[in-house]
Amino acid sequence: MKAERNIPYVLNYKPSEDDGTMFCDADYAGSHDSRSCSGMVCFLNGGPISWASKIQKLVSTSTCQSELISLAETVKEALHIRLLLEELGARPVGVPMRIHEDNSAALEMAMSDKHFSKAKHFKVRQSFVRENCRPLEEGLTPTATVIQTPTHLQLSDGLTKALSKDLFKVFQDAVTTTPLCIDTKEALLACTSSPVHWR
């Protein structure tokens, strides 16, 4: 995207029944010191309202562990966003957030009661995800539900690693960014209903 680096973009939102959908991913050992990179994005009303991309503090020894770290951080963000939106009246009270994860091993480790002898040092994260994503006592709902999603539909992929131009365009379209080809804020307000960023 070198040729477009100076083109500003806006985020577009539209009326939608989506009341909170999140995607999380991890790029295993992609940094120079073999640390993995976590990526997370949360969508509301057709556009992203929260996102993150950061190098993990721990060195993971497998893709599964790096994905579990990313999933645990996403659950923390889901808890915060859900409480905020409920307090603002922007989403129904008691409805779990939806988190999309593409790694089946991480999902099994996070949601199963099985004991994983080689993952004891990740047990706290495992327990945190399980506690917040499984049905609680009768009448209570979990913070979020985790859904296994095919890798090609993982919308946080662009937040974990560099993509080819074609894949980046797919990611860009997925997060509903639109080129801003006008000079004034007034024109911006006339062409999009909910601009949240310009430069």
Question: Where in this protein do the model-derived segments appear?
Answer:
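RNase H-like nuclease module associated with reverse transcription
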Residues: 19, 54-199
